[in-house]
Amino acid sequence: MIQPQTYLNVADNSGARELMCIRIIGASNRRYAHIGDVIVAVIKEAIPNSPLERSEVIRAVIVRTCKELKRNNGTIIRYDDNAAVVIDQEGNPKGTRVFGAIPRELRQLNFTKIVSLAPEVL
C-alpha cells in the first residue's frame, strides 16, 4: 500500500534511484495505491549525468509492494521492497531495462512493454 510521502525504489535504468509518491492517479480521494497503479512522484535521488534530475516530477507505475498481493487462486505474493518503473504520458517506460521480478497482473493492465523488459514474471 503506497500513500503520499512514501519512498519507492526505481526498478529500471531511467536514471532515477529513489522516488517519493505525491499523488495517486485515479479517483480524486484515493488513499492507497497498489501494484499496477500509476502515481505522480518526485525524484529524490538520481544518478549523475542522467536525463532525469533530482526534484523532477514524473509518473511511475508501481511494480512491487511490501503489502501482500492476493490472487484469485489463493496464492499470496509479497516483495521485500516498494518499487516503481518511471513511465511517460503514454504509459511507456523511460528506461530500457527493468530490474527484479514483476507480477503478471501488469500484463492485464496493458503494461506489456514493462512485462517484456522484465527478467522474471511471477
Curated annotation (Swiss-Prot):
GO terms for molecular function: large ribosomal subunit rRNA binding; structural constituent of ribosome. Disulfide bonds: none annotated. Keywords: Chloroplast, Plastid, Ribonucleoprotein, Ribosomal protein, RNA-binding, rRNA-binding. It is found in: Plastid, Chloroplast. Gene3D superfamilies: Ribosomal protein L14 (2.40.150.20). The keyword Ribonucleoprotein applies. This is Large ribosomal subunit protein uL14c. It comes from Arabis hirsuta (Hairy rock-cress).
